[in-house]
Swiss-Prot record:
Localization: Nucleus
Signal sequence range: none
Coiled coil start-end: none
Annotated protein name in UniProt: Transcription factor E2F2
InterPro entries: E2F, E2F-DP_heterodim, E2F_WHTH_DNA-bd_dom, WH-like_DNA-bd_sf, WH_DNA-bd_sf
UniProt KW ATP-binding keyword: no
Entries under SMART domains matching the protein: E2F_TDP
Database matches in Pfam families: E2F_TDP (PF02319)
Region annotation (Dimerization) ranges: 137-226
Major location (coarse): nucleus
Tissue: Ubiquitously expressed in eye disk.
Length: 370
């Protein structure tokens, strides 16, 4: 660069002479060419081709490999110190003073406290009133009584585990059998309860039947009003289970805990009579008393009457309606105490009459045979 500046200065100074300037221009061009060639050729010449040892590059792996021996030594020393401390505690009948342990092991007190904190956290040692005194509490049994108690507790635990497994297995079998019984098509026609069943089970308790609702409400001796509604606002069918359509009062209840008015509960056997009875209440779910009030939607009067008529028609025309069977409402048990309907045909017996040994076709069809 310095030669190029000199050449440019020479060029401005020799601008007046024509021949000299042309000669100088040739020299400048030759000088620039030589400078360029030297600049290009100077790079490989100035390089040092002697082989030098490569500079080591520090990497995280190298640093970790260099620090691992130190860490291993520290961890190994900590483990070794812990083993020595545990042996020292066991040698002193399970208790030792940390100050004495520090002097015996010839380590810093901080190292001893680190070990004791970890051992206390996992429940192997226990510190007494004084923090410097520790007592060994785990890792073995000090006497035969502890071993005996352990064996007894272990055997009892195993016995209880066996009982639990047996109960779980029986419960699984019971649930499976119940599921099979409920899924059997022949048993679905008997999946119901009658009014007599509810009265026998609950006795004098007041029972309201609500479809698809399983909840028990305890009504105490206070003024309560029971109101039941659906989230979608549709009508709901609620019946009060009573004896022969009339509510009963507990004779032992002197305060008149349940004093209900007359309530006609439609049933498959009495729906025809209740529909013709003019004294029946307008809403079959209304119960109004002094202590308890129960209300239903007044607009369901027509719907209830329609349901009663449909049920009555199903009972009367059961032989003409396809897909309907009275067994959905009452089982075929002739030994019921108060059967709703008397079954006339077919009879209970397989055969009302039988032929004797000396009778034949004539006696069967009551025909005069010659």
């Amino acid at each position: 660069m310095y030669k190029r500046k000199t050449a440019s200065i020479v060029k401005r100074d020799s601008s007046a002479a024509g021949t000299t300037s042309s000669a100088m221009m040739m020299k400048v061009d030759s000088a620039e060419t030589s400078v360029r060639s030297q600049s290009y050729e100077s790079t490989p010449v100035s390089m040092d081709t002697s082989p030098d040892p490569p500079t080591p590059i520090k990497s995280p792996s190298n640093s970790q490999s260099q620090s691992q021996p130190g860490q291993q030594r520290s961890v190994g020393s900590l483990v070794l110190l812990t083993q020595k401390f545990v042996d020292l505690v066991k040698a002193n009948e399970g208790s030792i003073d940390l100050k004495a342990a520090t002097k015996i092991l010839d380590v810093q007190k901080r190292r001893i406290y680190d070990i004791t904190n970890v051992l206390e956290g996992i429940g192997l040692i226990d510190k007494g009133r004084h923090c410097s005194l520790v007592r060994w509490r785990g890792g073995g049994f000090n006497n035969a009584k502890d071993q005996e108690n352990y064996d007894l507790a272990r055997s009892r635990t195993n016995h209880l585990k066996m009982l639990e497994d047996d109960l779980d297995r029986q419960l699984e079998y019971a649930q499976r059998n119940l599921r099979y019984v409920m899924q059997d098509p022949s048993n679905r026609s008997y999946a119901y309860v009658t009014r007599d069943d509810l009265l026998d089970i609950f006795g004098d308790d007041s029972v309201f039947t609500i479809p698809n609702y399983d909840e028990e409400v305890d009504i105490k001796r206070n003024h309560y009003e029971l109101a039941v509604s659906l989230d979608n606002g549709s009508a709901i069918d609620i019946r009060l289970v009573t004896n022969q359509g009339k509510s009963t009062t507990n004779p032992h209840d002197v305060d008149g805990f349940f004093d209900y008015h007359r309530l006609d509960t439609p049933s498959p056997s009495t729906s025809s009579h209740s529909s013709e009875d003019g004294n029946a209440p307008a809403c079959a779910g209304n119960v109004i008393t002094d202590e308890h009030g129960y209300s239903c939607n007044p607009g369901m009067k027509d719907e209830m009457k329609l349901l009663e008529n449909e049920l009555t028609a199903k009972i009367i025309f059961q032989n003409y309606l396809s897909g309907h069977s009275l067994r959905r409402f009452y089982p075929d048990d002739p030994n019921l105490e108060n059967p709703p309907l008397l079954q006339l045909n077919p009879p209970q017996e397989d055969f009302n009459f039988a032929l004797k040994s000396d009778e034949g076709i004539c006696e069967l069809f009551d025909v005069q045979c010659s």
